Amino acid sequence: MNKWSRFKFTPNLPLGANGERVTGSKAHIELSKEAAKEGMVLLKNENNVLPLAAGSKVALFGKGTFDYVKGGGGSGDVTVAYIRNLYEGLKLQKEKISIFEELCDYYRNDIKKQYATGAVPGMTIEPDVPAELLSKAQAYTDTAIISICRYSGEGWDRKSVIDPNNKALWDYEREMTEKSAELFKDGDFCLSVKEKEMIDTVKASFKNVIVILNVGGMVDTSWFAYDDQIQSALLALQGGIEGGLAAAELLVGDGNPSGKTVDTFAKSLDDYPSTYNFHESRNYVDYTEDIYVGYRYFETIPGAAEKVVYPFGYGLSYTTFDVETVSAGVVNSNCTSETNKLYAKVRVTNTGKFSGKEVVQVYIAKPQGKLGKPAKELAAFEKTRELQPGESQLMILTWEINDMASYDDLGKVKKSAYVLEAGSYDIYVGTSVRDVTKADYSYILNHDVITEQLSAKLVPTSLPKRMLADGSYEALPQSEPVDTDYSAIGNIDPSLTEGVAPCQRAIPYFRFADGMAKNGSHDIMDVVEGRITLDEFVSELSIDELIHLLGGQPNTGVANTFGIGNMPEYGIPSVMTADGPAGVRIAPEVGICTTAFPCSTLLACTWNPDVLEAVGRAGGEELKENNLALWLTPAICIHRSPLCGRNFEYYSEDPFVTGKLAGAMVRGIQSNNVGATLKHFALNNKETNRKNSDSRVSERAAREIYLKAFEMIVKNDNPWAIMSSYNMINGYRASESEDLLTGILRDEWGYEGMVTTDWWTCGEHYKETKAGNDLKMGNGYPDRVKKAYDKGAISRSEMETSVKRILGLILKLD
């Protein structure tokens, strides 16, 4: 096939064997199910109620039995051929268990009626169970399964607040916020009144009670964790197209849960330090908890540990394991300090009666020193293979010594530097942040070591204070904020940010032709075939042609998130993008069903990079088969708060596990010669007023927590694209931040790929380009960029730099 033939939008050419399509194929759907099974977390299993014994009879309670949520809303939604709910999954286990059908008929009909009146999955009302049905269910069995579901999505958060001054709300954002507030008075972290009533009824009526959580993120688990009337609980999260079957197979013992939590589950929403200021202001969020996010807070701050129900890294199994640290130390004592690694050699033995997998986790306890540190930080992890009863596996986990350094933003040791402070770096090995044993070896430093000297970036001007390791706060320097709304060409018309489709050069299909006049004498194929360099090609383009390439292009083929390129007179194809984090998103009206994979948080709970790489590879195949070029995933913002409406499409509260697993996703996607897009860069931890909210954060917290996963993936996995976020960071729009997009991303990390805005940001296009944001989506503002050029506010050189990155991405495609 000739280069870029797919982007002519001839009929989509199948990638499978014997001319079969891989999109939505049985193999990809099976992969989705197996990935979901590997990530689901067994939270509780008293008296070994699970797995269900052969011949068991069960009664299914809760609207979630039928109101199954495969994934979140917005860009994370996927068009699929079907969705397998929990009931349907359990019905396929008919040779092992039987179900009280009359109760299921009641729930099915109720949910069907609610859908008919406009309800969406996960946002239905929990119905009352008739007393007669309850009595029949009791007579049928002593075992009940309760399913609790939750749905959230792009544009609204999980404790609903509508900003009356926000004129940029799309209709569905307002509607879903209002519906969530109606169903969950205290936010959907908590049970609704109707859910509480149903659960109390079930507990009083059945001997064995099992809970299934079909949710997208952190919820209240205290109601079952400490209740002796509830024996078992499975954190099933949002499992994609076959999520109901994945959960059902685990319930009957066709597979053994091996997932681990990637977030800390606290007793109350108020126990998270981010809660009190999440909705403090429509205009800003103060990240006063600083680096103490998730387990870094709960394991460090005095009194916080007792607030935890299920800790980070936690998960039970149907079997038991013995984890022994054989040895630990320096990998090679002859190495220079810049390349030294530490290791832990660990033996894992299956001591139970079921085959299964275990996750070995290594944490570092650093000296508090002058900077203060979390009590423990994840340094390495690895999942075993499937171990049979009595079988052992010897594992060697390694990590860079320099990765244990902390960033000094105030000059307590060395300003704007990563520092290893003198003292003992203790190694803890185990199966969760709490179930760990201290290794015999500690890494000792007798003096402070500067591992990397940088310069101040993203310095806050208005963050008043930040938390310290003892729970107190230190005041931070304040300065006069800069007027970031200034534009050399006047204010932006608000209509430009309201989702206007690309209208410049609206060419409906790609064609190799000379139908348009062009400024240059060469074709892009001259670059492909080595006759001229990319620099030479770009130097021949006119200003108008450069500006054209800086903006998004009309949809072609099956795309619905627009494309890039689109200059047929130069042979430059129009290559298309596609959402989203749980599968390739194609508009329903197109008629193509793709594979809905588990939500990102569930994939992260696998703690298995091989699974993430396989899912990425399959998704990349579906992208390519449908003539799409750039997948707008993975999304890797940190789970700062349970309230964020898009936590389901992000990975974890921990940047290390996020970076390792999302990096594997990137490798899988790009193995198909299509691009992955890291998003949202950065600190997009809130959906309410997301286009204007200012994330006020210390430079240390930004670097150590919120940028760290991006840094890991940029340095290790070479993503083709990065998407900047809507929000502001310390007074500057992320899409206009030279500190972020050039100073940190390119100068410090060495990134050479393309940066795109999120779709229809409120940023000024020319300022975004100057900052290092190469592409404005879904469309550019060519007239404003041209006006800025005419006034000298942006140079040709700055535009050429971005155009070369955009064309560089296109040139990677086959």
Regions found by a protein language model. Name each.
Residues M1-D435, A456-D814:
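Glycoside hydrolase catalytic-domain context in secreted enzymes
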